[in-house]
A protein has these predicted regions:
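Hydrophobic anchor residue at the start of the ABC signature
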Residues: 193
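Q-loop/switch helix immediately C-terminal to the Walker
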Residues: 132, 142-156
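Conserved ABC ATPase "signature" region
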Residues: 151, 160-176
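The feature captures the beta-strand-to-loop junction immediately N-terminal to the Walker
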Residues: 86-88
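Catalytic Walker B motif of ABC-type/P-loop ATPase nucleotide-binding domains
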Residues: 204-208
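H-loop/switch region of ABC-family ATPase nucleotide-binding domains
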Residues: 238-240
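Conserved ABC transporter NBD signature motif
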Residues: 102, 106-126, 262
Length: 283
């Protein structure tokens, strides 16, 4: 099983050239028909609420290939909390987020990862609980519309999300029918956040979700994330926008010399100063 965007597919192999291009084309076709079949369905009615216990990475080393880049004693996301991940570019933030998602099992070189007590090795069950929204446009199919993406993730994760209300709250309703290749960077970011919320997953891992947004749209996105946390979901957010992170999150993780370090909740000014002290020698 491979991935096209954020969606698992059996079509993707390890080949290259025309064979890989054909595989990707087939994956697009498969998703197109899947979306067409579910786009007009009503969401499933929610069943009894499930009790969540947290997402935990313990005594782990994280990296890629033969390289270990991070050591983690403990990273724990309890239900109904938001945490920030703060570090300069190239420190390993994205690698860590990929490891936490379970989509990239080779990122975890040692240690254990579990969501609600379900080990990442039980990948199908784990994938129902944890969703990664990656940076850039890798989560989006350029020829499919925003509403098709949302319908697909709602069905794939068997979610009861109210797509209309979600789109209204994020202000993306006016361009739902546009193919994502015609959307601006900010519009794509909001569609990706809507997709993450629409999955219904209790644990959302968001890589730079506020990049490319103007101040008004950043506030809208932060309000949406805050609402999901109030409903009991857990959110881990990487960002360089320290003011927004300080306002949104309960705690922070810094990456210091290849080690993940948890910080206490602090004000925006304190967080900025701690960032400067840690990474820029207190300038």
């Amino acid at each position: 099983t491979g991935y096209v965007g954020c969606f698992p597919t059996e079509f993707i192999g390890s080949g290259s050239g025309s064979a890989s291009m054909l595989a990707v084309a087939l994956a697009y076709v498969a998703v197109f028909f899947a979306v067409g079949a579910v786009a007009t369905r009503s969401p499933k009615q929610p069943g009894p609420a499930k009790k969540h216990h947290g997402l935990e990475l313990l005594d782990a080393s994280v990296g890629y290939g033969s390289t270990t880049i991070l050591s983690i004693g403990s990273l724990f996301l309890s239900p109904g909390t938001a945490a920030g991940l703060v570090a300069p570019n190239g420190s390993g933030k994205t690698t860590l987020l990929e490891a936490l998602s379970g989509q990239f099992p080779t990122r975890i070189r040692s240690g254990s990862l579990a969501a609600d007590g379900i080990c990442q090795r039980r990948s199908a069950e784990f994938a129902e609980l944890v969703y990664l929204s990656s940076s850039g446009g890798a989560d989006l199919y350029p020829t499919l519309s925003a509403i098709e993406h949302l319908a697909f993730v709602r069905e794939a994760w068997k979610s009861a999300a109210d797509i209309d209300s979600l789109c209204d709250s994020l202000g993306i309703s006016p361009y739902l029918d546009k193919p994502t290749r015609k959307l601006s960077t900010g519009m794509k970011q909001q569609v990706k956040l809507a997709m993450a919320i629409a999955t219904g997953c209790p644990y959302l891992i968001l890589d730079e979700p506020l990049n490319g947004l103007d101040p008004g749209k950043r506030k809208t996105s932060c309000d949406a994330m805050r609402s999901e946390v109030a409903r009991g979901r857990s959110v881990l957010i990487s960002s360089h926008l320290l003011d927004d992170l300080a306002d949104l999150t309960n705690s922070f993780y810094f990456i210091e010399a290849g080690t993940l370090v948890e910080k206490i909740k602090s004000s925006s000014q304190t967080l900025k100063q701690e960032y400067l002290d840690t990474y820029e020698g207190g300038e």
